[in-house]
Amino acid sequence: MNTALKASQSIEINATCESVWDTMTNPEKIKVYLYGTETNTDWKVGSPIVFQGNYEGHVYNDKGNVLEVKENELLKYNYWSSMSGTEGKIENYFIVTYRIEQLSEGKVKFTWQQEGFPTEEKRKHTESGLCTMIEQIKEIAER
């Protein structure tokens, strides 16, 4: 895994840390901003994660594990994408980190970071879609 290649995006959200946390861990809300993805996990350290769905006609079944949890602050997990064209070996897993930082009452900074890209081209492709996804996360959390 090449941890040097990272994609990251931050946004200020007018919501509580709890609301943003719920947006990031609630399967029904994840489905809204993650292209209809079904998410199955209990978000406990060491637990498996399964992301599955259909993206532009391609069925996917991605798998990973929860690595770190600090409720309402930090969530870190790894996953392998069945659409990556690689074997499901740990060295082909991505690492995703969500950080929620309270800026003031009712305002937080949310950061999404993904690392482990095999090429700069794949990193840029992911980064190009992050802005839209982050805006959707903000919209959901502010409801």
Please identify what each model-predicted range represents:
Residues 39-42, 59-105, 115:
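Hydrophobic-ligand binding "helix-grip"
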Residues 10-14, 50, 65, 99:
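Generic structural detector for well-ordered beta-strands
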Residues 54-56:
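Short polar/acidic secondary-structure junctions
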Residues 20-21, 30, 49-51, 66, ...:
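Hydrophobic pocket/interface hotspot
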Residues 2, 109, 115-143:
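A conserved amphipathic terminal alpha-helix motif
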Residues 1-38, 45:
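Hydrophobic ligand-binding cavity/cleft-lining segments
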